[in-house]
Amino acid sequence: MRSKLLNGITSVIIVLALLSFYGWSVRKHGIPGKAQGLWGKFLVTLTSFPDLVTQAAEEVEKLPGTFVPTHPAFEPVNRLDYDINVLVSYSNEEGNRAIEVRNLKTQAVKKSWEVKGGLKPHHRIMHPLLLSNDRIAYATNGYDGIYCMNAVGEQLWHQKEIGHHPSMNAGIGETMWVCAYDLSEASHPSNGVVYEMGGVKYHFLDNYIAQLDTETGAILFKRSMAELLLDHGLEHLIIKSVVVDDPIHLNDVEPVLESSEYMLAGDVFLSFRTSSVILHYRPSNDSIIRVIEGPFTSQHDVDIVDGQTIAFFNNNAPTKRFKEDGGRNKEPNLLKYPAYSSHIKYYDFASQTFSAPNREAYSQNGVYSFTEGLFELLPNGDVLIEEQNPSLLWVFRQDSLLFKGILPSHHEGYHHLLNWTRVVD
């Protein structure tokens, strides 16, 4: 009996000694980033295993980036007294991409298309364009070209020479304009432009505009934005951006459909996000008519209001994220700025002035999108806004809120990511 007791005590002492040695070894050699030798690396692997299992489980449970958590306090608003039909796209239960014409007032689906095959979980169909005879022009952010399908989902054409990101708009006649990447020599965009500063070379991504024939998909016009800036003495806009590898970030090409005193049919307005500038460009003679800069940053979605006015979604955000407190949280607050919010900015060519009507209403409702975002002026004067980052849709009548909504998804607690909602007839 005594012998068994001694053996038990001895075993406990040995186990405690081994645990003590193991704990000392982990503390001494097994800290990630400080591990030395084979023994240290072994300890890191051993002690990190539970974390790896947890991380793997979280990754399995994580939803693709095409879904957005719905805020627990979200309350929809629908005071619409008329129909608004919008073209939306989202990831459906089968993992394909649905494109729909949906009535915001009733949530009824009027028309639908489905894109199948070759899709990765994060792929988005951004800003699809409804053409005549219920044809749909579309592309994914997977850089595999631009497609067109008919009303029953049959592919009509596939333009492989350019990739699309992020907007496409109807042009004059059976044409369309797209923001594009050149894929004629590679299957993906590359940082193919370089400049030198202080003996250091910097490479960056070029952007293109392209005009397509909507009947065939043939490219009618294509222009490099990097070359355009260089050819017109505007290369300073490249180093104005804090995003060195993406200093242009073309996010909209808006065609002029009717001539006026300040613009000609066939002109286009180009929105460069990371340099916070809008160019008025005339492809017919390769001339830049205006460089528009002012009290706006990271803007998107230029729209033509009338013959002398344009408007655009002013994200009113820095072009690159920084520390939340700017790294100076220990300094006393001497001056506090009002909160920044996104809004719609108007530019009048006649007076060369900016305005932002109903800005307070947008601010009071918390409208803010660090990236992306768009708006559309409705025929009755109301305004539809896509607050893209949280993926909320808004309709305002001057300073009154008429609609606040989401695209509900099949995942509880999540709604669909918005992909540049378009108002259609």
Residue ranges and their predicted role:
Residues 1-4:
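Positively charged n-region of N-terminal signal peptides that target proteins for export
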